[in-house]
Amino acid sequence: DSEFAELKIRGKIFKLPILKASIGEDVIDISRVSAEADCFTYDPGFMSTASCQSTVTYIDGDKGILRHRGYDIKDLAEKSDFLEVAYLLIYGELPSGEQYNNFTKQVAHHSLVNDRLHYLFQTFCSSSHPMAIMLAAVGSLSAFYPDLLNFKEADYELTAIRMIAKIPTIAAMSYKYSIGQPFIYPDNSLDFTENFLHMMFATPYTKYTVNPIIKNALNKIFILHADHEQNASTSTVRIAGSSGANPFACISTGIASLWGPAHGGANEAVINMLKEIGSSEYIPKYIAKAKDKNDPFRLMGFGHRVYKNYDPRAAVLKETCKEVLKELGQLDNNPLLQIAIELEAIALKDEYFIERKLYPNVDFYSGIIYKAMGIPSQMFTVLFAIARTVGWMAQWKEMHEDPEQKISRPR
């Protein structure tokens, strides 16, 4: 039987359908309120508003649960690889062995970008931020695929594959250009993560051998960042896509949103904060500063808009961080890790943070891992974009397949 919520406005009662979720909270359908009640709902930041129905990702922030297509994020991070998770998000189920092989071959086949794109890179000054270069390059792909300016349903899957394949190449090119080194072409004999590391760190005169511990760590990072419900950048991609904009333009809007320090740039802010603290002996001082409303200092890497429990991604990354630093001989002498571990221990016992449910989030340890890998801080958000492209494309595809979706137009 259908359930309804009652909304009383100026003495008149309106019955609003309650939509049953397959998992998680039920939802009150307010889509007819403006037409029937002659008023709108007001929800700054969409704190209590669902903009779509989605089966891609589920989060229970109170319990610290994150699932992709029903699979727990910890299981995926430990037992899967990034392209298998990409297939899961795009198609809705894990691939068979044959499907996985075909998918990885297609991604490898489309990893090259048009050579004319090199001219675009040359228009940027050498000090340009890699995110600025990447943003322009991804948007410019529209010029190389004019047939997708008027895309069809038959184009969805190939478009997703092209995007997943080309973003790492563009990301590595952005980095190489920013440091004045020649571009390195993709090597299709390598898997997805190895290939990206190869394009980042190889040079024409030296071969780069990928450390398997580093590769596995980056694979986990990519999986952990692949999708996260209707966050700012994903919502931006959906809003752009709702107008019928071509997929390259949509993904470039997601990159722009991700670039914001409150979204994709948070792990770089964590590194800067740990450097500012400087030593474990100063942690109590900075804890006090974080509690002081009049002090501009903020404890970065703690708290999350959705999670009111320990971010499950942070738990995986904490152990991954230790594995990487142990492999590199830095486990016992990395000052940033020591400060981070002690800061977390102190904060989790402090009533101020406990009452406010401020737990470490995904950004708290990822920057330390990147830094240990030799990835500079200006590339942190670029790597986030590589991973999140999978989620953006899954959500973009789902949006276009949803008959209820309309052009987004907030009031």
From Swiss-Prot:
Reaction equation(s) it catalyzes: oxaloacetate + acetyl-CoA + H2O = citrate + CoA + H(+)
EC class of the enzyme, as a word: transferase
Pathway as given in its UniProt record: Carbohydrate metabolism; tricarboxylic acid cycle; isocitrate from oxaloacetate: step 1/2
Signal peptide region: none
EC number: 2.3.3.16
Catalytic site positions: 304, 363
Keywords: Transferase, Tricarboxylic acid cycle
Cellular component GO terms, alphabetical: cytoplasm
GO biological process: tricarboxylic acid cycle
The keyword Transferase appears for this protein: yes
UniProt-listed Pfam families: Citrate_synt (PF00285)
PANTHER family reported in the protein's UniProt record: CITRATE SYNTHASE (PTHR42871:SF1)
The family this protein is said to belong to: Belongs to the citrate synthase family.
General remark: Citrate synthase is found in nearly all cells capable of oxidative metabolism.
Protein name: Citrate synthase
Organism field: Rickettsia japonica
